[in-house]
Amino acid sequence: MRVAQVVRNTSETQISVKIDLDGTGRQKLATGVPFLDHMLDQIARHGLVDLDIEANGDTHIDDHHTVEDVGITLGQAVAKAVGDRKGIRRYGHSYVPLDEALSRVVIDFSGRPGLEFHVPFTRARIGTFDVDLSIEFFRGFVNHAGVTLHIDNLRGVNAHHQLETVFKAFGRALRMAVELDERAAGQIPSTKGSL
């Protein structure tokens, strides 16, 4: 079973993430940031991973620490659940549309953290959610999952649609990358022999 639980406590946030990479998309989310919960739901449902995430943070100041630290903790949990990366497909990609919006996400479980985030948001906030926090979420994720991640919103007018297509495509790309390839069972997907 490829499951993991990570608890991260700082003076700013207390976060618990449980993940099952071979799940069905079941989720239980309570981050204190409703729009973040909505986006995490997209990862679970479209990635077919089971996610239980609880967070208590200093949201009385703003949502920055909570969103970033959920990304960090989710990245740690994914890295732990994937383990030595033997037998995974390693690469994943997805294009997802939502009405006028279209996003592409490509992920590589390379062991080298890197983020290319290109989303020309049409407004600064979605409700009360600061769209800049999405960058902090994904930066935290890549740095702690050890992945290279390219995120491109190719078109969109509605900022909610833009970001929702990003999270849906991320879930689908994640699913593809961590999927076990029976033809490569027990093998590291790299000519170097390690990731």
UniProtKB/Swiss-Prot annotation:
Uppermost EC category: lyase
Family from the record: Belongs to the imidazoleglycerol-phosphate dehydratase family.
Pathway noted in the entry: Amino-acid biosynthesis; L-histidine biosynthesis; L-histidine from 5-phospho-alpha-D-ribose 1-diphosphate: step 6/9
Protein localization: Cytoplasm
Enzyme Commission (EC) number: 4.2.1.19
Disulfide-linked positions: none
InterPro entries, per database record: IGPD_sf, ImidazoleglycerolP_deHydtase, ImidazoleglycerP_deHydtase_CS, Ribosomal_Su5_D2-typ_SF
Main location: cytoplasm
Pfam families, sorted: IGPD
Coiled coil feature spans: none
Lineage: superkingdom: Bacteria
One GO term (biological process): L-histidine biosynthetic process
Reactions catalysed according to its record: D-erythro-1-(imidazol-4-yl)glycerol 3-phosphate = 3-(imidazol-4-yl)-2-oxopropyl phosphate + H2O
GO MF assignments: imidazoleglycerol-phosphate dehydratase activity
Record's GO cellular component terms: cytoplasm
Key words of the record: Amino-acid biosynthesis, Cytoplasm, Histidine biosynthesis, Lyase
The protein, known as: Imidazoleglycerol-phosphate dehydratase
NCBIfam families assigned to the protein according to its UniProt record, in alphabetical order: PRK00951.1-1, PRK00951.1-5, PRK00951.2-1, PRK00951.2-4
